[in-house]
Swiss-Prot record:
Catalytic activity: 5-(methylsulfanyl)-alpha-D-ribose 1-phosphate = 5-(methylsulfanyl)-D-ribulose 1-phosphate
Species in which this protein is naturally found: Drosophila pseudoobscura pseudoobscura
Official protein name in the record: Methylthioribose-1-phosphate isomerase
Pfam families listed in its UniProt record: IF-2B
Signal peptide start and end residues: none
GO MF terms held by the record: S-methyl-5-thioribose-1-phosphate isomerase activity
Length: 362
């Protein structure tokens, strides 16, 4: 059974504190928007899909017991809280898109004379809860599309009708801990395993926050997948020596041209994969694709505190007085990406804007 990082019933939300993993499994109550902002900003919950889900559900928990005098006052409350949640980690586009979707719903309901304030609140709660269910369904679809694409490429390269079990590499954490469940890039790995087509999965440590070593490795051991942890600096040697069939990573934001912002270190893995002729896939729901941003040059990159580089827990590991540069993400150019795996299929970066626009119109 997959790990459960988010526990929700109407009026109650708990998240698995990912800063304590893998040593301790502890759930934290999220009693409202302020708690939601803090757990997102402190990275106690992380992963673009999970950030959006937890942010929206924290608002649902906050307004659940409240009574509002008018639809206008409810709408104003929702707008202010949603904008605040978006500010917790601005690089991850999913929270912004979810906020825009919910605010659009609130605006429509405010204008609808057939809906009173109680019904408006109910409709809003229903919409936030539907996002939780949809994320899990979308992740399963991403897994199916991604596994199929990888196996087809491997079979074609071998001139065989069917691919055998494959070895894959992933970076950061994109599984049940980063989503509502199942995972994006790790969902592809999960689907390969379910098909009996996973020979081995390699995961990077993902410095400086060690999401790969702490979280992905934790999930892989939990699932009993054949898995090996490697240092970030070993990727070139790994691709040269271990016959890796594909790299599959997640995304925090994908620009209209296919440029992809993901956890720091993704860009260099893509460069190395290109050199070795290893297909490089990005797995992300449509909510991670921002067609309003023409290229990766326009993506705001969050910078994290020096302490995340200089300390492990309370122990300093870097020389006192050294300066640090600690961007949380980098941008992988579309030219290095083989395909972008979504819940609606796998798309080449050059076709992304046109294809997604058509999908959203249907």
């Amino acid at each position: 059974m997959s790990l459960q990082s988010i526990k929700y019933t109407r009026g109650s939300l708990e998240i698995l504190d990912q800063l304590l993993l893998p040593v301790q499994s502890k759930y934290l109550p999220v009693r409202g928007v302020e708690d939601g902002w803090k757990v997102i900003n402190k990275m106690q919950v992380r992963g673009a899909p999970a950030i959006a889900i937890v942010g929206c559900l924290s608002l649902a928990v906050e307004i659940h017991p409240e009574e509002f005098d008018s639809k206008k006052s409810l709408r104003q409350e929702l707008e202010g809280k949603l904008n605040y949640l978006v500010s917790a980690r601005p690089t991850a586009v999913n929270m912004k898109m979810a906020a825009d979707e919910l605010l659009s719903l609130a605006n429509d309901l405010t204008k609808d004379d057939n809906v009173d304030v109680a019904a408006m609140k109910q409709r809003f709660l229903n919409a936030t809860e539907a996002m939780l269910k949809k994320d899990i369904a979308d992740n399963r679809a991403i897994g199916a599309h991604g596994a199929k694409a990888i196996l087809q490429l491997v079979a074609a390269a071998a001139g065989a009708p069917m691919a055998g079990p494959v070895r894959v590499l992933t970076h950061c954490n994109t599984g049940s801990l980063a989503t509502a469940g199942y995972g994006t890039a790790l969902g592809v790995v999960r689907q390969l395993s379910e098909l009996g087509k996973l020979e081995h999965v390699y995961c990077t440590e993902t410095r400086p926050y060690n999401q790969g070593a702490r979280l992905t490795a934790y999930e892989l051991v939990h699932e009993k997948f054949p898995a090996t942890l490697v240092l970030d600096s070993m990727v070139a040697a790994l691709l040269r020596a271990k016959n890796v069939a594909a790299v599959v990573v997640g995304a925090d934001r994908v620009a209209a041209n296919g440029d992809t912002a993901n956890k720091i270190g993704t860009y260099q893995i893509a460069v190395v994969a290109k050199h070795h002729g290893v297909p490089f896939f990005v797995a992300a729901p449509l909510t991670s694709i921002d067609l309003h941003i023409p290229s990766g040059d326009h993506i705001i990159i969050e910078e994290r505190p020096d302490r995340e580089m200089t300390h492990v827990g309370e122990h300093r590991i870097a020389a006192p007085g050294i300066n640090c540069w600690n961007p949380a993400f980098d941008v992988t150019p579309a030219s290095l990406i083989t395909g972008i795996i979504t819940e609606r299929g796998v798309f080449q970066p050059a076709q992304l804007k046109e294809t997604i626009t058509k999908l959203l119109e249907t």
